[in-house]
């Protein structure tokens, strides 16, 4: 009876919601700390959604646990259209394989509104420590080390990509885990390991201690047009992997709310000014409605099942 009553209430209230929504500020839950690229991009979208709706985004950053803390908070929120979640691929596709006792269901606990943007990863070396200009040269160099290969990683995505490369190249290597991306990049500059997969934005600025050999996406980036994909670089069986972000809401949000927000978010994602803004972070627009986001989530989840098995990652 309670479920039936809730459904009847939503049906009765939906016309009013459609007419008045949003009538007050909207809370947006983020997975990162304030001031970093994902947070700044979120605020960019928020300002334009405020212009379109007349109501501001109030951002609540809840970093930690690869996005699980934020995802749990969003999933537990009241589905009234006033709590949103800038949902990352890690929380929506990867964590189910990486974490024991996940405190939310990435499929059942959310309503998917729209895709927003994506971030790519690149294969990078310190040329002063690893004298390779191509992936083929890197493979030859690492094989010459006879089992003494090391790589650095900060996130599960970086670890998965590194293990895929080693597997396809027929090389064994030891990982070095870091607590922050900044720390990992500092250690790369110091020549503490042989290679890493890192955020593409680190490849935008020339640096004598950093050389990009390939990009882990399905096609070349317009920001790094001379950098080949892993497939083009000789790893024909490499699966692409990138970080995507979408707008999600708690399960049970009225359809009229989604129908109002989806075209607004999609319009922002397709603007030329958005593409230009995202270039600053080596990010790309990733427009699409909730159906497109669901398909992307399913595909990424399938790929993560492969990566976790390949990298022999045990859920923690």
Per-segment meaning from a language model:
Residues 1-9:
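Sec-dependent signal peptide recognition
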Residues 23-25, 45, 167-168, 255-316:
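An extracytoplasmic/periplasmic, membrane-proximal ligand-sensing/linker region
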Residues 43, 47, 51, 72, ...:
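Solvent-exposed, polar/charged alpha-helical surfaces in well-ordered, non-transmembrane soluble domains
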Residues 88-89, 127, 199-201, 217, ...:
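Short secondary-structure boundary segments
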Residues 105-116, 152, 172-176, 194, ...:
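Short beta-strand->loop
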């Amino acid at each position: 009876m309670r479920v039936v009553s809730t459904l009847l209430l939503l049906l009765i209230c939906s016309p009013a919601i459609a007419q008045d929504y949003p009538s007050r500020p909207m809370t947006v839950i983020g997975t990162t700390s304030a001031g970093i690229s994902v947070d700044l991009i979120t605020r960019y979208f928020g300002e334009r959604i405020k212009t379109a709706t007349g109501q501001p985004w109030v951002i609540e950053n809840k970093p930690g646990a690869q996005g699980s803390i934020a995802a749990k908070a969003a999933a537990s929120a009241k589905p009234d259209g006033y709590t949103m979640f800038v949902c990352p691929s890690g929380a929506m596709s990867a964590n189910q394989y990486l974490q024991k006792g996940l405190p939310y269901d990435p499929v059942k606990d959310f309503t998917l509104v729209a895709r927003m943007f994506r971030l790519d990863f690149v294969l990078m070396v310190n040329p002063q420590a690893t004298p390779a200009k191509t992936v083929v040269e890197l493979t030859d160099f690492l094989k010459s080390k006879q089992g003494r290969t090391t790589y650095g990683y900060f996130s599960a995505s970086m670890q998965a990509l590194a293990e895929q490369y080693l597997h396809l190249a027929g090389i064994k290597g030891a990982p070095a885990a870091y607590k922050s991306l900044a720390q990992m990049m500092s250690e790369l500059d110091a020549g503490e390991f042989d290679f890493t997969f890192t955020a593409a934005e680190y490849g935008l600025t020339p640096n004598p201690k950093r050389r990009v050999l390939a990009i882990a996406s399905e096609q070349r980036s317009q920001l790094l047009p001379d950098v080949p994909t892993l497939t083009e670089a000789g790893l024909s069986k490499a699966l692409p992997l990138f970080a995507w972000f979408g707008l999600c809401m708690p399960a049970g949000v009225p359809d009229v709310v989604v129908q109002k927000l989806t075209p607004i978010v999609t319009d922002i994602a397709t603007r030329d000014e958005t593409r230009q803004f995202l270039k600053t972070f080596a990010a790309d627009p990733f427009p699409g409605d909730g159906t497109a986001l669901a398909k992307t989530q399913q595909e990424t989840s399938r790929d993560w099942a492969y990566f976790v098995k390949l990298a022999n990652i045990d859920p923690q």
